[in-house]
Swiss-Prot record:
Phosphorylation increases the actin-activated myosin ATPase activity and thereby regulates the contractile activity. It is required to generate the driving force in the migration of the cells but not necessary for localization of myosin-2 at the leading edge. Phosphorylation is reduced following epigallocatechin-3-O-gallate treatment. The lineage of its organism: Eukaryota, Metazoa, Chordata, Craniata, Vertebrata. GO terms for molecular function: calcium ion binding; GTPase binding; myosin heavy chain binding. The modification Phosphothreonine is found at residue 19. GO terms for biological process: regulation of cell shape. Myosin is a hexamer of 2 heavy chains and 4 light chains: interacts with myosin heavy chain MYO19. It comes from the Eukaryota. Coiled coil: none annotated. This is Myosin regulatory light chain 12B. It comes from Rattus norvegicus (Rat). Residues 1-16 have a biased composition (Basic residues). Ca(2+) binds at residues 42, 44, 46, 53.
Amino acid sequence: MSSKKAKTKTTKKRPQRATSNVFAMFDQSQIQEFKEAFNMIDQNRDGFIDKEDLHDMLASLGKNPTDAYLDAMMNEAPGRINFTMFLTMFGEKLNGTDPEDVIRNAFACFDEEATGTIQEDYLRELLTTMGDRFTDEEVDELYREAPIDKKGNFNYIEFTRILKHGAKDKDD
């Protein structure tokens, strides 16, 4: 063994992957159970869940899913479903939150200039007058830790990242 292979804490070459947080959401026994479930669904054992795997698994349960139903299930993933993606999707379902892009796109509907921000007064008006209306106190609570710049722009891209992955450590 060469000394170059010794662990050092000075290198910061590997960026953190967005999906790495999903493994922290579950303990080792839960991850093992998810792995067993994944392997049961992955009928052809290629390391990915595809439409045929879903069909075969549902058929084994006495179901006869339509192509449209299977397509809708497959379209919930942004790409091929490997174990990490499977775990991420389950984590989002169990956490009760929408995927990051769905949340970001909901905010983007009100960002006419595609700046990644919404004026905080305008967002307050939207939140208190449309859909499931927030109270002013709830909006105040939301804004307390929200990324709002000095010009009053609510950065919904950063807010969505914080919502899904937690706040960055700051030296406040």
